[in-house]
Amino acid sequence: MSTFDNTTQLAPLKTWLKESFALTRFELQPLVNDASSRQYFRLQMDSGSHVVMLAPPDKENMAAFIAIAKDFARQGIYTPEILAYNIEKGFMLLSDLGNDLYLNLLNANTVDDLYTRALSVIHQIQVCNPKLPNDQPLDLFNEQHIRFELGLFID
């Protein structure tokens, strides 16, 4: 799915991490990708961990991603903190939210609370109106967009 070639992109990413953050010892562990051309890695260091996102600049609008993340944070929506980025190269360093999944926490005692909280956040996202760079509009999630997204499963 991704347009990134790991051997081509990981070397510049490692250089960016070393030069930007004075890292000498670290490991990049691949994380499960989402349904986009982005790739995620856990950056494991002696001092802890962060998440690194690779976003092909020709496929992903990183400026919009940053604007939406900032707006979500202002609205109190819990998202990873953006620690650093290089838009031209498609690199982003994010805080690490860990591995906890709702699926692992769901049981008869937690189901009502977890789903109530999830629906509350979905509502917050729906009413959020982020300001994108250059006043560009958010993509509409209409039938055409849904068909495009579903077509990704065929790839």
Question: Where do the language-model regions lie?
Answer:
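ATP-binding glycine-rich phosphate-binding loop
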Residues: 23-41
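Alpha-helical interaction segments
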Residues: 5-6, 29-32, 142-144
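Conserved P-loop NTPase mechanochemical-coupling segment
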Residues: 155
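ATP-binding pocket architecture of kinase catalytic cores
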Residues: 41-148, 152
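Charged, low-complexity surface segments at secondary-structure and domain boundaries
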Residues: 1-3, 138-139
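Juxta-kinase regulatory segment immediately upstream of eukaryotic protein kinase catalytic domains
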Residues: 2-26
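Alpha-helix N-cap/loop-to-helix initiation residues
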Residues: 6, 36, 58-61
